A protein has these predicted regions:
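Conserved acidic catalytic loop of the alpha/beta-hydrolase fold
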Residues: 133-154
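Catalytic active-site module of serine/aspartate enzymes centered on a nucleophile-bearing elbow/loop
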Residues: 318-356
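Conserved hydrolase catalytic core segment
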Residues: 150-193
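N-terminal cap/lid subdomain of alpha/beta-hydrolase-fold enzymes
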Residues: 52-121
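Short beta-strand/loop motif that positions the catalytic acidic residue
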Residues: 289, 295-297
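Alpha/beta-hydrolase-fold enzymes
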Residues: 175-260
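Conserved alpha/beta-hydrolase "acid-adjacent" motif
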Residues: 302-309
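Active-site nucleophile elbow and catalytic-triad environment of alpha/beta-hydrolase enzymes
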Residues: 269-285
Length: 356
């Protein structure tokens, strides 16, 4: 029982960034892009992008901004999710790898996420279907048109953000000095991964209370099933066994986790977010990436299982690419290892050093 409550308290603090900080005060802002055109040709009269920044931009003698770091969140997440003791507390503080007194840190809420424009704002299923390319293009506009950032020292991201890091690399190959994708693969979403994402959507749509997206209350049965599917995608068998070593504790932990996610998730937003990966496929474009790149996965990541051998094949296409597979330890946490700099900080230090 005590283990479960401690697990949930830590998870709550981690998600909400409520642990004391050792880095500069984050500043929040919004940028509205007029008549944004999506990859499918549909347009949104006003696309709002929410963002958080820490620090101040600096320029070199060549006029390029030389200290901007873009960090991208995962599916159903937001930029604020990085502002916790485990991530920001180990990266953004004085003397740390991404010291916010030295770097200009940019945390954005992607299309469909956080405080940026999303289906639940009112359009529901009339909201344009978006892709990772749309997210990257919108963020590029935010950086160049609003924040006046003409160059990035580093692009890094976790999960969906890691996948977007690859897209950034080949879409704007001269825009960054370094790239670090965490918990991702640079290939089409297929096999078990695609089946899991498709199942999330199907479970929601199968609930009669979904009502083709026109629900007044969340379709609890379908959304609960989708949340359960997501939990098993990103969890660690080792860590969950440690947190819930008995049947009673496991069932209690499951109920509490599902209930917590039910309180913050919207069904339409969730479906759109997982469907945004449907056209993702960097593999044919990897040779276009110019910046030094270190990709990091963990051996207990069930979203990107190492036995597929996909990264080892694809990383060869990246001229300055390197792949690190973290072994399973008591500190790794499955897919979520991407948010623990203590596990991969040494490789970030290496990347920053070789890309000066």
């Amino acid at each position: 029982m005590k283990k479960i409550y401690m697990f949930l308290i830590i998870l709550f603090l981690f998600v909400n960034g409520m642990i004391s900080q050792n880095y500069p005060t984050p500043l929040e802002g919004d940028y509205v892009i007029k008549n944004f055109e999506f990859e499918n040709g549909k347009k949104l009269k006003e696309l709002n992008l929410h963002y958080i920044t820490l620090g101040k931009p600096a320029k070199g003698k060549d006029g390029k901004v030389n200290n901007a770091v873009l960090i991208k969140h995962g599916t159903t997440g937001n930029g604020k999710s990085f502002l916790n003791s485990r991530f920001a507390g180990n990266l953004f503080g004085p003397g740390q790898l991404l010291d916010a007194n030295k770097y200009f840190i940019i945390l954005t809420d992607d299309i469909g996420h956080g405080k940026s424009s999303k289906p639940s704002d009112g359009l529901r299923m009339d909201f344009p279907e978006y892709t990772y390319d749309d997210m990257v293009h919108a963020n590029y506009k935010l950086l160049t048109e609003h924040l006046n950032i003409n160059h990035l020292r580093l692009v890094m991201g976790t999960s969906m953000g890691g996948m977007q890091s690859w897209v950034w690399g080949y879409t704007y190959p001269n825009f960054m000095d370094a790239i670090m994708p965490l918990a991702s693969l640079p290939v089409e979403i297929a096999g078990r991964n695609r089946m899991q994402r498709a199942l999330i959507v199907k479970l929601i749509k199968m609930d009669p209370e979904w009502k083709n997206g026109e629900y007044s209350e969340q379709p609890k049965v379908g959304l609960s099933g989708a949340i359960g599917q997501l939990m098993f995608m990103v969890s660690s068998p080792l860590q969950w066994q440690k947190s819930a070593p008995t049947r009673e504790e496991a069932e209690e932990m499951l109920d509490k986790l599902v209930d917590r996610y039910l309180s913050i998730m919207d069904a339409n937003d969730m479906m759109y977010a997982f469907e945004s990966s449907r056209f993702y496929n960097p593999a044919p474009h990897l040779s276009k990436i110019k910046a030094p790149l270190i990709a990091i996965n963990s051996a207990d990541d069930q979203v990107n299982p190492p036995e597929l051998g996909l990264m080892e094949k694809e990383i060869k296409k990246v001229e300055n690419g390197k792949f690190i597979l973290l072994p399973i330890t008591d500190e790794t946490s499955g897919h979520g290892t991407h948010s623990n700099p203590m596990m991969w900080g040494e490789y970030l230090a290496e990347l920053l050093a070789i890309s000066k």
